Curated annotation (Swiss-Prot):
Alphabetic keyword roster: Initiation factor, Protein biosynthesis
Xref: Pfam families: eIF-6
InterPro entries: eIF6 (IPR002769)
Name of the protein in its database record: Translation initiation factor 6
Function according to Swiss-Prot or TrEMBL: Binds to the 50S ribosomal subunit and prevents its association with the 30S ribosomal subunit to form the 70S initiation complex.
Gene name linked to the record: eif6
Superkingdom to which the source organism belongs: Archaea
SMART domains: eIF6
Amino acid sequence: MIMKTYFSGVSTLGVHSLATEDYGFFPLSVDQKTMERMKNVLDIPATQLNISNSSLIGSLCVGNSNGLLVPDITTEKEVELIKMFLKENSLDVNLERLKAKNTAFGNLILTNNKGCIISEELSRFRKTIEDVLDVESGVGNYAELPTVGSNGVATDKGCLVHPLTDELELEWIQNILRVDYVERGTANRGVTSVGACILANSKGAVVGGDTSGPEILKIEEALDLID
């Protein structure tokens, strides 16, 4: 199932939220009706919060069913809210505050529950990232861009990436994430940073409200969401 929506008129949903197979985080600005619809489409418990006193949740955090990485500028109150949410939903998730010069972990890491791709900008933290997310990783860029997280969206079934990703890079991504499908595409009528526009897991996807019909078809194919 795929749902189209905006967050207060904004279509870059992946910048402002995070979705995994088992949980989701959304900005405080999202109304309750939209929250319930997204929770239903993705079939996950979710909560609303800030990270580092910011709504840029998807840019700053990265997570999967095993772990969650947040920047060390995340406040104690925010960390406690996350811990409380995880406990209330009986989720055994490793939560790590990582100190790094570049705090945009969501932009620089692409992960599912089988593997992760780490931007060269975070290569020195590879072991920590692997341990927290409990997956093996590959370090590198694709489409000549270091922002591997914001230029891709991955689930345990498939992956959609920047349209300039070449064939060798597609094969590399597929091998690391261990998915059946890796496709190139766009969202929000031509935006190439698909990770900034889409929230997805193996059960559904939420896409920016500007996303066209042909783009939705490609997203469904790449993420294996066609019924």
